[in-house]
Amino acid sequence: LNYGCMTSLALDPIEKKPLAQFHSGSSILSIGSFGCNFHCDFCQNAIISQENHVEYEKLTPEEVVNLALRLADEQGNIGIAYTYNEPLIGYEFIYDCAKLAHAHGLKNVLVTNGAITSKYLMDLLPYIDAMNIDLKAFTSGFYEKIGGNLELVKENIILCSAYTHVELTTLI
């Protein structure tokens, strides 16, 4: 449904992902689509994560990677960050981009709520260099309210930290 539909593209400081301990001071091409599997009242990006009528530009994985490579040459870009909305709801596009970017020596950063089955996560992890996982709260009741599962997120935090660089965010 949202394969290649980019609502946002920007060259951002890596610290904006936010990642404090991964290539500090560098820039990364940040891309995002629309949609999310959670429904948080406090969402910073609700306009793109929860709205049905969002403007977007259709891009292929090759176009995204070529843009990232051009920005690497021109502005020191280190890779691609999948962010703004919940990128894992567009898993196939993220997987295709990450695999291609990895083959070209670009870094892949995933900014996620961590709600994905371990099988798909394990397939993607070889191509992910760093993650910021948003731990929304630490109660099961809160996760039930927003449509998630705290235990799944905690399990994925542990799983991911065994394979790649992981930093956590708790917004509220």
What is each stretch, according to the model?
Residues Y120-M122, Y143-I146:
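Short, well-ordered secondary-structure micro-motifs
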Residues S140-K145, I157-I172:
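Conserved strand-turn element in the central/C-terminal portion of the radical SAM core barrel
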Residues I78-T83, D134-L135, V166-L171:
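Short beta-strands and strand-loop turn motifs
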Residues M131, K136, S140:
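Acidic/histidine-rich catalytic cores of soluble enzymes
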Residues N2-M131:
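Conserved Radical SAM active-site core
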Residues F42-I48, K136-A137, H165-V166:
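Short, basic/glycine-rich phosphate-binding loops at helix/coil junctions
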